[in-house]
Amino acid sequence: IGMRAFISNPVYLNKLVKQCSDFQSKWRMITYFHGEHTGVCHGIALSMCYGNQGYIDFDDITSGAHDYWTLGSPYENSKMKDMILYYQMTQCLDSGRSTYGISKNSGWGNGDLETFLKKFVAEAQYAKRVKKPFVFSFMIPEGGHSVVVCGYKKNTDGNHEITIYDENSYHPGSYGGYLTMKVSSDFKSFHFADSNSRFDDVCVEDLWTNLN
């Protein structure tokens, strides 16, 4: 899914401007507001999590809506479009930085992947216990993508299975769906493909769990 990077709601605009605390944040925001179409997977995933935790008034966006699924289409609802773009653009802000991260350029032999996967599994276990999903971002050959982590179980082999909702992909004919990321019991490897079974060669990137 893609949208033109333009927010008409002054409330969201003011929030973004007030949180641009330094030159780099402002520059990142300016480059986003060039008006061209942009992917909004992060905005959708993040707003899904905030909505689940009660931070979003669904009825204010779409009259009568009581959850994310009853909001309708952002292409037909400017309030929903602005909400998604707002959360998409919070990536430009210092306050919108990820909770945990691993650099795709750091290599896999220095222990960073193992540390990240341990934190990832711990967060998934906690999220299941308190029923609060969070956002997971990763890199694929075509670019970055964000999804919602919403479940966890440990299988009989001692490996970890993390349930993920992939809300969409930017490929033609793509669709949303649930999938499983498998993490080995020693946290040294993982197996993952998106909801369209496109990618096994994934570089893990970031977790967003501090949703407040």
Range-by-range predicted roles:
Residues S106-Y165:
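Active-site-adjacent substructure of cysteine-protease-like catalytic cores
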